[in-house]
């Protein structure tokens, strides 16, 4: 069975097409793998055995009739942020206890329309707030990777930790994820997988539980660049139900793979050389530069002067939008309800019991920066900084730079229940230092494995592109992947 779960999406697609395997066999192999591993890894919060089998059966029937879709019979995991009709959708929060939506998100509807099979819902940081998948009501996810000679559990990154861990542990062929400040790219880097955050507006947000509406964007996490390109093609679409959705044709991203990067201009931002950056990250970055150089790309030094303000500005804008978005959870119509002596007390009791510590922290920060006395001092200034960050990128791209290469994270995966990080939220927030600028500017960014560190843990590189030029990112990421190789964790679970 494990040889079936070892297939990439591209390989499984070809075997299904050739009728060498059936969608039912493939789905059963994944369900068996999940049943055997999920107690150890905790990647899934709900497994849809019956639905998966009936979707696989329907796929086999369509394949037999010659009516196969682009993802026919491919078993996928869905981050618990996407509405799935009649299936557990709780953003891994206690406050949404028992919530099963009456509708399907646009992203998942697109995937099912192309023939994909749903294996279940994936664990994540509560309401997508976190960088380690430790804020989930359903407990932390364990990274399938471990340091050489160690049994210590590591975090998979966040907030899409369940998506990244499930892909790395071969508990799904690919997964949906979301990225508000790095929640696709950071977990991908921590697990040796590939994750792309598309341009803001490229993929519909409809039916995705909102965290920070002007920053949220859905994308795939997959085992390699080709699989990420295949998934992205199905996920992206114009959607009139999302006012930020852009009416641009969706290219065949897979076709960009294998194109030469000869003459492509790759920018290296000097501001990303942050104080205290570990030597292994600097080394990885140099390796990435060399890979692209060897393939014929032109490397240029660039400046993004407002980078140092990105993290503080992000941690004002995102909580402000979150405090507004999360005001709707009150226990009245759905989810958890804790009785109170009157309606105001019921709201208070429900929200106090329903939200976790990190979500409460961000709601409080957001409410504070939006309050009348502080709005100008914090929120307005953060939005001005955001405009300057966007302009930095526009200036660089105007000079002919095609893509920007940076590290994806400031370190490899760290330990589960790290006391220093648990007691200092700002240290935890620093995990997003290389990724937040991309969300602030609405640009596309991809994380691709660049190598392993001295402890045998994966390290990721990030490529940032011009708006709606994801093809360039797939093209350059594929070159890095070909040079660096692919990485799979040694099985301990």
From Swiss-Prot:
Keywords: ATP-binding, Ligase, Nucleotide-binding, Protein biosynthesis. It catalyses: L-glutamyl-tRNA(Gln) + L-glutamine + ATP + H2O = L-glutaminyl-tRNA(Gln) + L-glutamate + ADP + phosphate + H(+). It holds the Pfam family Amidase. Its EC number is 6.3.5.7. It is an enzyme of class 6 (ligase). One of its GO terms (molecular function) is ATP binding. InterPro entries: Amidase (IPR000120), Amidase_CS (IPR020556), Amidase_dom (IPR023631), AS_sf (IPR036928), GatA (IPR004412). It comes from the Bacteria. GO terms for biological process: translation. The active site is at 79 (charge relay system), 159 (charge relay system), 183 (acyl-ester intermediate). HAMAP family: GatA. Heterotrimer of A, B and C subunits. Belongs to the amidase family. GatA subfamily. This is Glutamyl-tRNA(Gln) amidotransferase subunit A. It comes from Brucella suis biovar 1 (strain 1330).
